[in-house]
């Protein structure tokens, strides 16, 4: 029987508890989940590719069928095909996410009809969570521990200054 391999692509800058929740749920559905740190050409990343991989790996260490990989600059479906993945995981927080992700899923299906996009609805506690908001909160010294895994929290404060600790 063929292994069911899924890719969960994203810029993960930073990797959040919402991302982690999606990965945990996907890990129960698939034999292997590859968290693919992608390059988003429209964003200036806070973390390097190597830092993202380390943070994702630390955050998912308790999930034996999950691994983090850096995806080269190419289409996500091409990356998925190159590692034998037949499923692409996308987390959906709200209606706006669904519209955007449905459009991408349609294009991905046109590019490779063998790769299915699977939408996982975010737990309601994560539906307003975004990497951008988390970086903003951390930059102004806000407490982000409930929004990100512990390794990411430490890395955020190290990158953005430890304003939270001085309060």
UniProtKB/Swiss-Prot annotation:
Alphabetical UniProt keywords: ATP-binding, Coenzyme A biosynthesis, Cytoplasm, Magnesium, Nucleotide-binding, Nucleotidyltransferase, Transferase
Gene3D superfamilies: HUPs (3.40.50.620)
Site (Transition state stabilizer): 19
GO biological process: coenzyme A biosynthetic process
Main location: cytoplasm
HAMAP family per record: PPAT_bact
Its job: Reversibly transfers an adenylyl group from ATP to 4'-phosphopantetheine, yielding dephospho-CoA (dPCoA) and pyrophosphate.
Protein name per its UniProtKB record: Phosphopantetheine adenylyltransferase
Organism: Lacticaseibacillus casei (strain BL23)
Organism placement in taxonomy: Bacteria, Bacillati, Bacillota, Bacilli, Lactobacillales
